[in-house]
Amino acid sequence: SLALAGTIIEGASLTFSVLTTILDALGSVSRKIDVGVYNE
């Protein structure tokens, strides 16, 4: 039971780190788009 909880927590933290990475990537892309639009 405790091991299962640990596995769930590990999975959740891994998912969270992946989501954070994706959000960072999307944020940098949208900033590049904003700059590109602003420069035109």
From Swiss-Prot:
One of its GO terms (biological process) is pore complex assembly. Belongs to the actinoporin family. Sea anemone subfamily. Gene3D superfamilies: Cytolysin/lectin. InterPro entries: Anemon_actinoporin-like, Cytolysin/lectin. Residues 11-30 are annotated as: N-terminal region. Residues 3-12 are annotated as: Plays an important role in the hemolytic activity. Pore-forming protein that forms cations-selective hydrophilic pores of around 1 nm and causes cytolysis. Pore formation is a multi-step process that involves specific recognition of membrane sphingomyelin (but neither cholesterol nor phosphatidylcholine) using aromatic rich region and adjacent phosphocholine (POC) binding site, firm binding to the membrane (mainly driven by hydrophobic interactions) accompanied by the transfer of the N-terminal region to the lipid-water interface and finally pore formation after oligomerization of monomers. This toxin shows hemolytic activities. It is found in: Secreted; Nematocyst; Target cell membrane. GO terms for cellular component: extracellular region; nematocyst; other organism cell membrane; pore complex. Octamer or nonamer in membranes. Monomer in the soluble state. Keywords: Cytolysis, Ion transport, Membrane, Nematocyst, Secreted, Target cell membrane, Target membrane, Toxin, Transmembrane, Transport. Composed of a long N-terminal alpha-helix and a core region rich in beta-sheet structures. Before the pore formation, the alpha-helix binds the lipid membrane, partitions into the lipid-water interface and stabilizes the monomeric molecule on the membrane. Finally, it traverses the bilayer, thus forming the transmembrane pore. The Trp-rich region is important for the binding to lipid membrane. This is Cytolysin EnT. It holds the Pfam family Anemone_cytotox.
